[in-house]
Amino acid sequence: TTSRGKFSAAAGENFPRDVVELRSLLGPLQVGQRVQAVPGTGLEVPLWILGSSLFGARLAAHLGLPYAFASHFAPQALRDALDLYRVEFQPSGQLKEPYAMAGVNVFAAPSDAEAKRLFTSVQQQFAALVRGTPGQLPPPIDDIESYWSPAEKAHACAMLEYSFVGDPETVGQGLRRFVEQTGVDEVMAVSAIHDHGARLASYRLLAESMM
């Protein structure tokens, strides 16, 4: 446990081996197995690979695992990663066919205008990343255009490409189009909304929009 909790420069290189080891620890106890996960052994917990690059896509494909892509903040490689994953997928005991999920940002509110205002929190946060001043999620503002420079806006909007912002109809239509275009099996909705009540309401409206 201690060694697995430490980060080192070799962590990335060792990651594939660590995933295989974890899968074995969650499987049936083998004869001669020196380390046993308690609890864990025999639970067959489904493993996913979450990534934002082609490395994770290839690893998930070669291990026959479901793959989730972090396109809610790193959208550029989404299509290439999904294509690579599907082409190189090798069936496993957990999964017989490719199974993919994509992360998207969802900001749903009763009106498009209200949803766009809620969205300014994460827009400010990503602009702060561009400035090199990351921090906590700020409250929404009325005029995002006065907050960022054209360069900051371009960078933030590029990272937030897969964001669905609006009333339930707008969000629902956008998500259905996204699923149709990418062919993903699941969507992971991320809603970085400053007010907790508004965040819960956004998830409720999202659920209603997909019924």
Label each region the model flagged.
Residues F73, V106-A108, I193:
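Active-site-proximal loop/turn and secondary-structure-junction residues that shape catalytic pockets
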Residues T1-S3, A61, S202:
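Short aromatic-enriched loop/helix-cap "lid" or pocket-rim segments at secondary-structure transitions
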Residues T2-Q36, A77-G183:
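An alpha-helical appendage that flanks or caps ligand/catalytic pockets
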Residues Q30-Q33, V45-L54:
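Core active-site phosphate/anionic-ligand binding loop and the adjoining beta-turn-alpha structural block
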Residues V45-L50, Y67-A70, P98-N105, V187-A189:
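Hydrophobic faces of well-ordered beta-strands that scaffold small-molecule active sites
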Residues V179-M211:
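Generic C-terminus detector
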